[in-house]
């Protein structure tokens, strides 16, 4: 029987949460352009937005303590459901010992119309997709609904959120940029004072 919704799925030793299909970007390299699932999961396309209680029930059923971490990352931008995301993260922290991370495009404050960095204090790690060293290049490959201003908003978010979360990373996909662009991204991370995560393209 086909599942109505895949809310939880496993990636290596992590439990991943797929809470929305909404996203403010249309990245050219996004894994969802190439199929319905990721890492052998069932389809991550949701028939509807799951309620907070449905997400929580899926989390409990999966037993987070069996995993090395819980990660908010699916076929959408988790901060499009900021309140639900933070509620579930808080409940996980209250009931389990596992660290909680969110993978985000860093546009939460644009999406929600306010400074949302303090909301992310519930996360042990905030991993932000940098993807490019300039606003022009970022818009070229990420195609944000907010245009080129999304890039500066993302960097501002990174600067702010490091005040609230103990670990902040900016990630890049190695295959989508030149060596010069990668070097520029590394310098940008140094200027902001956060670590860079260089990951490989998953197609």
Predicted regions and their residues:
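Conserved AdoMet/S-adenosylmethionine-binding subsite of the radical SAM
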Residues: 75-203
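Short, basic/glycine-rich phosphate-binding loops at helix/coil junctions
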Residues: 34-40, 66-70, 134-137
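Short Fe-S-cluster ligation motifs
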Residues: 50-75
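A generic local structural motif
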Residues: 2-4, 56-59, 112-116
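Canonical Radical SAM [4Fe-4S] cluster-binding loop centered on the CxxxCxxC motif
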Residues: 2-50
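Flexible, charged surface loops at secondary-structure boundaries
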Residues: 9-11, 62-65, 120-121
